[in-house]
Amino acid sequence: MKTNCEFPLLCLLIVLVANVEGEVEDTGLKMVKRLWRNWEDPEQRQLLDQETELEKQREKRLWRNWEDLELRQLLNEFAENQREKRLWRNWERRQVANEDDGEKAKELWRNWEDLKRRQVADLNDEQETQRDKRLWRNWEDNHATLRKRSADSLSRQKRLGKERGKE
C-alpha cells in the first residue's frame, strides 16, 4: 500500500493500521518515516517560526503607519479648524471696523477665500506626499519580504534535495 500524505500523524495512523493488516510495503513505511522526520525537523520549525515572526512585524509596522497617518490627519484637521476660527474672528473684527468701507470688506473676503483655497491645496499636497511615501515604504517592505522568502525557499529546497539524495 502506497500513500502520499501531507499530515504526518495521519500517515503514521495509516501505516499502523496497514501494518496490522499486513499490507505495508517497505517503501511506504520509509516514506512515512521521512515525512515524520521532516515534520519534527527543528530547522524547518525555526524557518516557519521566523517567517511567522516577520509577517507579524510587517503587520505591526503597517498598523503603526496607518495609525500615524490617522493621527496626522486629525492634527491637521484640528489645526485647520483653529486657523479657520482665527481667520473668521479676524475677518469679523475687520468687518465691524470697516463697515463703511464695503470695498475693503469685499477684498478681505476675497483674501480669506484665497487663503482658504491655498490652505486646502497645501493640505492636499502634503497628504498626497505622505501617501506616496507610505506607499513607497510599503512597496519596499513587501519587495524585501518577497526576496527573503524566495531566498529562504531556495535554501530550503536545496537542503531538502540534499536530504533526499542521502536517503
Curated annotation (Swiss-Prot):
Keyword check for Secreted: yes
UniProt region (Disordered), positions on chain: 147-167
Signal peptide: 1-22
Residues where Pyrrolidone carboxylic acid is found: 95, 119
Keywords, sorted A to Z: Cleavage on pair of basic residues, Pyrrolidone carboxylic acid, Repeat, Secreted, Signal, Toxin
Principal location listed in the UniProt entry: secreted
Sequence ranges of the RLWRNWE repeats: 34-40, 61-67, 86-92, 107-113, 134-140
A Gene Ontology term for the protein's cellular component: extracellular region
Localization per Swiss-Prot or TrEMBL: Secreted
GO molecular function: toxin activity
Tissue-level expression: Expressed by the venom gland.
Propeptide: 23-94, 112-118, 139-167
Family designation: Belongs to the scoloptoxin-08 family.
Name assigned to this protein: U-scoloptoxin(08)-Er5b
Record organism: Ethmostigmus rubripes
